[in-house]
């Protein structure tokens, strides 16, 4: 029996099936591609402000951020990094607070030093401890201890240090040279400082009025830090103004002030070259030392910077000011956010760029001690006091600023009372004991 032949669908039916199948296939492929592309494309939002954090001119406002974004995007294809430009530093705190209240804060954002404790205490920041401990490409030993500690709250890490600033001592080299005095040594002491100030403080025109001075704007707090004095307990529940190191600080400041015979040097005296020393931040040094800013500021005399003079029980210590970077506790992109934080705060290339494009110090110690840093600081071939080893020592010795809620109020009161002691308005005998009791009573309420 002959089997029936099967020749498939009719010719017209074949065309109809093919005609229907091709568009269906293309539609499925298009939908699949669209879904995959949109699933892979992600946006990371960051919060930054324009300009310097240190109140000095900065030409290339977003140079470091732009470089970090470009490198991050290359490492994370399909990812967009977005930030709102043009926010001034003085407006940034309010802007960030508004974003947080609206629930639209960035995934990653800069934290002003004065705001860190607030955001950490209210649970707005992601605890980074696990990410830091679990990342084999991340080692906290590469950071300066004080900078890293600035991002710690309640013994947990909530932020990474981006860049730092420390206080140095501005030295009027022209004035010292005129008095046959050399630049201070790297380990100079209070006594060295006092001796130079005594020698240069004088009436140069013979009218009976002092017109040249040793120092301007040097505070008892800066002296206390360099003498190893600890003013407060870290949690702000106690103060230590009656400590022997503070007694030494007050005596030193009284002796220093007595050189001026009741006169107070002014900013104009300093600007016109009639003052030998003034505390000066590293950011100010970086901004005003090289051309062209040195022509616009302090151009009438040669100057440099040295470390802060050391007290009998201290070291050449400065308070470390740090710009921090935190992660929102509400972000849904924790891994991506951590990668960006690590890139900006830890990547050697980006940290080197902080030296090149900003007025701040990187947070990585090996970058400060690098050959590139030596080239950047080599402005004065004769005798620059600001060298990588000196800055490294300053950062290693640096201490954290106090950040407990009542700090500003306590310091305002302490400053007023200590100024009275130094000025001789309040007798020094037992004054610090009394001050300690008064401030402790307020702190422990």
Describe the role of every protein-language-model region.
Residues 2-118, 312, 425, 429-445:
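Conserved N-terminal structural module of periplasmic/extracytoplasmic solute-binding proteins
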Residues 4, 8, 48, 258, ...:
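Extracytoplasmic/periplasmic substrate-recognition and gating elements
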Residues 87, 113-166, 300-307:
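Hinge/lid segment of periplasmic solute-binding proteins
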Residues 107-110, 276-281, 286-288:
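Paired acidic/hydrophobic, glycine-rich loop segments that form the ligand-binding mouth/hinge
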Residues 129-142, 186, 205, 211-213, ...:
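Short, solvent-exposed loop/beta-turn-alpha elements that line the ligand-binding surface or hinge
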Residues 154-162, 167, 191-239, 275-277:
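Extracytoplasmic/periplasmic solute-binding protein
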Residues 196-197, 235-264, 308:
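Glycine-centered hinge/linker elements that transmit conformational signals in sensory
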Residues 355-420:
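Long, aromatic- and glycine/proline-rich binding clefts that accommodate carbohydrate-like moieties
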């Amino acid at each position: 029996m002959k089997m029936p032949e099967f020749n498939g669908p009719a010719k017209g039916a074949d065309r109809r099936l093919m005609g229907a199948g091709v568009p269906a296939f293309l539609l499925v492929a298009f939908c699949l591609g669209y879904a995959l592309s949109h699933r892979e494309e992600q946006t990371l939002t960051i919060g930054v402000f324009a300009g310097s954090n240190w109140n000095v001119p900065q030409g290339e406002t977003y140079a470091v951020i732009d470089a970090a974004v470009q490198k991050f995007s290359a490492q994370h294809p399909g990812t967009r990094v977005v930030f709102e430009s043009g926010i001034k530093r003085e407006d940034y705190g309010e802007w960030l607070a508004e974003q947080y209240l609206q629930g639209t804060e960035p995934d990653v954002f800069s934290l002003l030093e004065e705001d860190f404790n607030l955001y950490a205490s209210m649970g707005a920041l992601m605890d980074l401890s696990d990410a830091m401990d679990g990342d084999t490409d991340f080692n906290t030993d590469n950071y300066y201890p004080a900078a890293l500690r600035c991002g710690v709250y309640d013994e947990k890490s909530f932020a990474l240090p981006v860049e730092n600033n420390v206080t140095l001592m501005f030295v009027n080299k022209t004035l010292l040279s005129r008095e046959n005095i050399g630049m201070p040594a790297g380990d100079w002491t209070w006594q060295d400082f006092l001796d130079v100030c005594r020698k240069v403080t004088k009436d140069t025109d013979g009218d009976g009025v002092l017109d040249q001075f040793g120092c301007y704007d040097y505070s008892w707090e800066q002296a206390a830090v360099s003498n190893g004095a600890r003013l407060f307990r870290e949690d702000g529940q106690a103060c230590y103004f009656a400590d022997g190191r503070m007694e030494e600080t007050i005596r030193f400041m009284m002796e220093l002030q007595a050189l001026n015979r009741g006169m107070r040097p002014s900013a104009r005296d300093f600007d016109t070259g009639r003052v030998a020393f003034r505390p000066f931040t590293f950011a100010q040094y970086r901004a005003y030392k090289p051309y062209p800013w040195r022509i616009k500021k302090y151009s009438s005399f040669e100057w440099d910077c040295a470390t802060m003079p050391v007290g009998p029980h201290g070291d050449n210590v400065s308070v470390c000011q740090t710009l921090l970077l935190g992660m929102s506790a509400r972000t849904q992109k924790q891994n991506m956010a951590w990668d960006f934080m690590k890139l900006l705060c830890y990547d050697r290339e980006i940290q080197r760029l902080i030296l090149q494009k900003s007025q701040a110090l990187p947070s990585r110690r090996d970058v400060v001690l690098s050959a590139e840093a030596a080239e950047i600081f080599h402005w004065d071939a004769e005798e620059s006091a600001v060298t990588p080893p000196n800055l490294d020592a300053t950062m290693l010795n640096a201490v954290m600023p106090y950040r407990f809620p009542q700090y500003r109020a306590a310091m305002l009161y302490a400053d007023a009372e200590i100024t009275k002691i130094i000025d001789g308005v309040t007798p020094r005998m037992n004054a610090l004991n009394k001050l300690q009791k008064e401030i402790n009573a307020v702190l422990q309420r």
